């Protein structure tokens, strides 16, 4: 029976910052938040911190977000390695064009033992889960049968890598949308804020909403001042949403 895959989001990279030694400025933050502040102050050469309300990094970044000076947020980035996510969910994810992606290739990686991601609407129903996993098993059996026949069909292809690729890219047509995929996603702070505003909404599909909220929690640990305006709440159905009055970019 097909194994199910839980969502897992792992932080794998974040911006470092090296302050220029010839600039008369210090800050109480490091990494991406420090870089964002530096970029903002570079616009106005406000190294002396003339405004007490923006003298701290948190105060400065909150002001940046309040006034909509979002371009400076684009200098700092975070990368996640995401597993336990369905192919149907990544079809929505990759519509966010300001991110960079590197995704598992079904042309090079065989899917005979691929896991499935249970849609949120089926998680609490054993009968529905059983129907789903049976369908996934049938699809994988058909995939394996097609793969064997396609490899035989392309047996005259002398390049073994190309032969297997040709077979897999045709056989994958029968794999379900619930098939697990794995993907590296990199985005700058502005892009992540936009993603969360769009996909942590109650109007988003629950699977990608869960992804957005888990990313938000980890982003808030990396750059609290940049993401602190988002509030996570629970709806009547038990699912979570995240909203912010300052997330103004549609």
UniProtKB/Swiss-Prot annotation:
Induction: Is expressed under the exponential phase of growth, and down-regulated upon starvation. Expression of thyX is significantly increased within murine macrophages or under acid stress. Is expressed at a lower level than thyA under all of the in vitro and in vivo growth conditions tested.
Residues reported in the UniProt entry to bind FAD: 71, 95-97, 103, 188-190, 194
Known pathway: Pyrimidine metabolism; dTTP biosynthesis
Alphabetized GO MF terms: flavin adenine dinucleotide binding; NADPH binding; thymidylate synthase (FAD) activity; thymidylate synthase activity
Pfam families (UniProt xref): Thy1 (PF02511)
Group of enzyme by EC: transferase
Keyword terms: FAD, Flavoprotein, Methyltransferase, NADP, Nucleotide biosynthesis, Transferase
Outcome of mutating residue 69 to E: Loss of catalytic activity since it is not able to complement an E.coli thyA deletion mutant
Enzyme active site: 199
Regulation: Is potently inhibited by 5-fluoro-2'-deoxyuridine 5'-monophosphate (FdUMP), but in contrast to ThyA, is not inhibited by the folate-based 1843U89. A 5-alkynyl dUMP analog has been shown to highly inhibit ThyX (IC(50) value of 0.91 uM), while lacking activity against the classical mycobacterial thymidylate synthase ThyA, and therefore is a selective mycobacterial FDTS inhibitor.
Cofactor: binding comment: Binds 4 FAD per tetramer. Each FAD binding site is formed by three monomers.
SUPFAM superfamilies, sorted: Thymidylate synthase-complementing protein Thy1
Phenotype when changing residue 168 to A: Loss of catalytic activity since it is not able to complement an E.coli thyA deletion mutant
Annotated residues for binding of dUMP: 87, 92-95, 103-107, 172, 199
InterPro entries the record matches: Thymidylate_synthase_ThyX (IPR003669), Thymidylate_synthase_ThyX_sf (IPR036098)
Catalytic activity: dUMP + (6R)-5,10-methylene-5,6,7,8-tetrahydrofolate + NADPH + H(+) = dTMP + (6S)-5,6,7,8-tetrahydrofolate + NADP(+)
Start and end residues of each ThyX domain: 7-233
Cofactor: FAD
Gene3D superfamilies: 3.30.1360.170
Role of this protein: Catalyzes the reductive methylation of 2'-deoxyuridine-5'-monophosphate (dUMP) to 2'-deoxythymidine-5'-monophosphate (dTMP) while utilizing 5,10-methylenetetrahydrofolate (mTHF) as the methyl donor, and NADPH and FADH(2) as the reductant. Is essential for growth of the pathogen on solid media in vitro; the essential function is something other than dTMP synthase.
Miscellaneous field: Was identified as a high-confidence drug target.
HAMAP family found in the cross-reference section: ThyX (MF_01408)
Assembly and oligomerization: Homotetramer.
Protein's UniProt name: Flavin-dependent thymidylate synthase
Organism (species): Mycobacterium tuberculosis (strain ATCC 25618 / H37Rv)
Source lineage: Bacteria, Bacillati, Actinomycetota, Actinomycetes, Mycobacteriales
Gene that this polypeptide is encoded by: thyX
């Amino acid at each position: 029976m097909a194994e199910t895959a839980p969502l897992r989001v792992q932080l794998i990279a974040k911006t470092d910052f090296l302050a220029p030694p010839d600039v008369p400025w210090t800050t109480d933050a490091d990494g991406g938040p420090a870089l964002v502040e530096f970029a903002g102050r570079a616009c106005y050469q406000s190294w002396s911190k003339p405004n007490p309300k923006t003298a701290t990094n948190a105060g400065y970044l909150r002001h940046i977000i309040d006034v909509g000076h979002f371009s400076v947020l684009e200098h700092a980035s975070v990368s996640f390695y995401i597993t336990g996510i369905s192919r149907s969910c990544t079809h929505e994810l990759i519509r966010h064009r300001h991110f960079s992606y590197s995704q598992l290739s079904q042309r090079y990686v065989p899917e005979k033992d691929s896991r499935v991601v249970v849609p949120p609407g089926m998680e609490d129903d054993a009968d529905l889960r059983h129907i789903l996993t049976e369908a996934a098993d049938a699809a994988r059996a058909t995939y394996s049968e097609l793969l064997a026949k396609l490899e035989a069909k392309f047996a005259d292809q002398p390049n073994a890598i190309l032969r297997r690729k040709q077979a897999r890219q045709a056989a994958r047509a029968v794999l379900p949308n619930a098939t697990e995929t794995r993907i590296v996603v990199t985005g700058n702070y502005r892009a992540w804020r936009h993603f969360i505003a769009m996909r942590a909404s109650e109007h988003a599909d629950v699977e990608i909403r869960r992804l957005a909220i888990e990313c938000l929690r980890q982003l808030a640990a990396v750059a609290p001042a940049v993401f602190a305006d988002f509030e996570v709440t629970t709806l009547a159905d038990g699912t979570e949403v995240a909203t912010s009055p300052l997330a103004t970019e549609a």
